[in-house]
Amino acid sequence: MTAHRLLSRPSGRALASLTVLAGLTVLPAARAGGGVSITSYGHSALLIQGGGARVLLNPFQAVGCAAGLAEPRVSADVILASSQLRDEGAPVASGRFLVKPGSYRVAGLAIEGIGAPHDRVGGKRFGPSTLWRWRQGGLEIVHLGGTAGAIAAEDRVLLGRPDLLIIGVGGGAKIYDGQEAAAVVRQLQARRVIPVQYRAGGPSASCDLGSIQPFLNAMAGSTVRRVGSSFSVVPPVGDATVIELMR
C-alpha cells in the first residue's frame, strides 16, 4: 500500500486551536467528546453523526450484494467512499464526495485517506480503494469497509488504534474474509468494531459475500452486541474489543 501523509503543520494562531496526533490534525469541533450516533443503511453504508458533522460511508446502488436494500439517498457534510464501485461509491447521496487518498478538512473534521489495493492481487481485478481515518465526537474512527488487501506496517502506524473500526468481513474477491478481518482487528487493537459487507440472507448468484459467522468464530471470546439499525458510542470506550452487529 502507498501511504499518503499530506497534512501540513499549522502555524501562528492556528497552532493554539489544533491538535496533531500521529500525522492527523484534529480540529476543535471534531475534538469535542460528545460521541457519535451511527445509522446503518445496510451493506457498508453508515451515517455517522457527532461533533457537529454528518459523515456518510459507502453509499450504494441497489445492485449485486446490495440488491433489495433501500439506497441511502440522504444528505451529509462529507461522503467517504472506499471506491467508485456501484456498491460502495454510488452517486445517490448529497454532500462532498471523497474517494481519493489525501488529506482533507470538511465540516470541522480532519480526514486522512490512505491508498490501498481493493483485492488480494494488488488491485489488478478491482483497482484501488481508500482507507479512511478521522476523529469525530472525541473518537478515533477508521473505515476499512472496502478492501481485501493486507495492511502494511507503515499504514498501521497511520491508522493508529481506532476507538471505532468499520471493516468488511464477508470475503469474496474484494473484501476481507472472517479470518483476515479478525487479524486486522487484532493488528489495530480496535476497541469497537462494526462488521460490514457480509451476506445476511441465503446464497445469491449475484453476490460472492459470505455470512458473518466466520468472522464471529474468528473473534471468539470478544463481546458481541446486537445493536439494530442505530446506536451511539460515547467516549471513553475502554480497551476491550466489542463487536457491534448492526442490521
Residue ranges and their predicted role:
Residues 28-34:
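Sec/Tat signal peptide C-region and signal peptidase I cleavage site
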Residues 110, 125-126, 192-247:
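Binuclear metal-ion centers of metallo-dependent hydrolases, dominated by the metallo-beta-lactamase
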Residues 120-188, 204:
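Active-site-proximal loop/helix segments of hydrolase catalytic cores
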Residues 48, 102-107, 132-134, 231-236:
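Short acidic-hydrophobic surface loop/beta-edge motif
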